[in-house]
Amino acid sequence: MALSKSMHARNRYKDKPPDFAYLASKYPDFKQHIQINLNGRVSLNFKDPEAVRALTCTLLREDFGLSIDIPLERLIPTVPLRLNYIHWVEDLIGHQDSDKTTLRRGIDIGTGASCIYPLLGATLNGWYFLATEVDDMCFNYAKKNVEQNNLSDLIKVVKVPQKTLLMDALKEESEIVYDFCMCNPPFFANQLEAKGVNSRNSRRPPPSSVNTGGITEIMAEGGELEFVKRIIHDSLQLKKRLRWYSCMLGKKCSLAPLKEELRIQGVPKVTFTEFCQGRTMRWALAWSFYDDVTVPSPPSKRRKLEKPRKPITFVVLESVMKELSLKASSLGSETAEGIVVVTTWIEKILTDLKVQHKRIPCGREEVSLFLTAIENSWIHLRRKRRERVRQLREVPRAPEDVILALEERKSTPKELSSGQDVAHSPQESALCGLDVPGGEAAADGGHCLSQKLLCQEETPEATEDERDEERGGMEAMESCKGSSNGAQDGEASEKGDRLDGAAGRYLFKCLVNIKKEAGDAVVEMHWVEGQNRDLMNQLCTYVRNQILRLVAS
């Protein structure tokens, strides 16, 4: 997953990544490393050390006017990631809010062959750097890169003995107070860690770029954890010789123990951040012994990114809206048309269901409702209707001769006086659904007429809508706790819903938008929060079918 959107806000590559096609057209040295696929897309092989080096050198030349040489046998830095660190140091020392003419002094521990941090800091901000290096090859290349960019007056590269960090490097400059130190420590403790044998989760994809670092650049005794602890130990002795101490970390698991170490040592000011570039994530830790420094806030905890979910929608056709308007007029309501009448009926349905709702401000030609469902009242009604239909289906059908006899009786009605008692035959009583003495004998002689058929003749649209409603909410019904898998489950669900309501909790909250599109009304349900998104799906299906029933009735 690309993390470029999480780069530092001032990073020039955050919203405008390098244009490989443009760079290739301008720099022949870079052009020979690009690849063009059948769709014309330009890419770079980040597992090729020469290609990675060409990209770094080209970006420094194009965007910062810097010309450098880097040996393939040493670490090749990526420019966007290093730029993140520079911008964070700006935040630490308050560079953006201070007088830009004030000289800022920094230390780069282990500057590397590229000397990239001092070169960027001096070029962008005019900072003075003391850059230390233990490796002979890196030291020689770093001095050469500083000299060929005419920055020797701002960058001093010094060769130091192995395991030298801050104490020995500052012996000769005991009177100078530095504003900050930077460090990109060796990440690994041994070859196995460097190769990812015992340090990389098997579920993670392999690294997308090549590692060209030398032994002293990528490995140290105890790995980055012990390396940074040594810097902490030096800082406890130097204290206010530096306003800010900082280090970049390659492993997130190193962050917590280092923060704990600083807490144990009583360091008053501590902060951290994250550096993001492409698929690469790095962490940085900073601490200070000064009381007057401004501590940048650490990054807020980000929830795992979720794909934006589309709202649940249904369309109310223009013809249906006209019928709803006529229906409202026939019931004595004020005449309303368009999305207003749709909203009015939806609000009535929600009120009947005891779903809390209120209108909220929105744009023109649109109505918005904020819903809070306290209990699953719609599924209770659905369950009752399904149970009623099931009971009707279990009533046996009467024989055809009985039906014919009933029709003949209807065609030749008898005149009866108002005070005369009416005697029903067992068959006729069964057709009308009456309790008849000797009903068992009648049942033995034949079957009763299905009351479901009579129900269908009275309201033919109800059964069709019921089937449609069941189809629309079937998946939600199966996955929801409120679904009916029998009388016992239904009873438990109802009790649970009542408990939720009694305790002041809610099932879910959603936003309903009713807007006009091409003469029709589109109803959208947007999930906000709650127990189960399927519950919103059930409610949407119920509301839609209730609107269709209103038109059909």
Swiss-Prot record:
Enzyme class, broadest EC rank: transferase
Modified residues (Phosphoserine): S329, S425, S429
Chain segments carrying region K-loop: 163-167
Region (RNA-binding): 17-20, 199-211, 250-254, 277-283
Description of activity control: Methyltransferase activity is autoinhibited by the K-loop region that blocks S-adenosyl-L-methionine-binding. Upon activation, K-loop changes conformation, allowing S-adenosyl-L-methionine-binding and subsequent methyltransferase activity. mRNA N6-adenosine-methyltransferase activity is inhibited by zinc.
EC code: 2.1.1.348, 2.1.1.346
Binding site for S-adenosyl-L-methionine: R82, G110, S114, E133, T164, N184
Entry annotated with the keyword RNA-binding: yes
Chain positions covered by the region annotation Disordered: 457-496
Composition-biased stretches (Acidic residues): 458-468
GO BP of this protein: mRNA catabolic process; mRNA destabilization; mRNA processing; negative regulation of 3'-UTR-mediated mRNA stabilization; post-transcriptional regulation of gene expression; regulation of mRNA splicing, via spliceosome; RNA methylation; S-adenosylmethionine biosynthetic process
InterPro entries registered for this protein in UniProt: METTL16/PsiM, METTL16/RlmF, SAM-dependent_MTases_sf
GO CC terms: cytoplasm; nucleus
Location of this chain's protein in the cell: Nucleus; Cytoplasm
Cell membrane listed as a keyword: no
Region described as VCR 2: 506-553
UniProt modified residues of type Phosphothreonine: T463
Positions of the UniProt region annotated as VCR 1: 289-400
UniProtKB keywords: Cytoplasm, Methyltransferase, Nucleus, Phosphoprotein, RNA-binding, S-adenosyl-L-methionine, Transferase
PANTHER family in the record: RNA N6-ADENOSINE-METHYLTRANSFERASE METTL16 (PTHR13393:SF0), SAM-DEPENDENT METHYLTRANSFERASE (PTHR13393)
SUBUNIT field: Interacts with MEPCE. Interacts with LARP7.
Family to which the UniProt record says this protein belongs: Belongs to the methyltransferase superfamily. METTL16/RlmF family.
Function summary: RNA N6-methyltransferase that methylates adenosine residues at the N(6) position of a subset of RNAs and is involved in S-adenosyl-L-methionine homeostasis by regulating expression of MAT2A transcripts. Able to N6-methylate a subset of mRNAs and U6 small nuclear RNAs (U6 snRNAs). In contrast to the METTL3-METTL14 heterodimer, only able to methylate a limited number of RNAs: requires both a 5'UACAGAGAA-3' nonamer sequence and a specific RNA structure.
Protein name: RNA N(6)-adenosine-methyltransferase METTL16
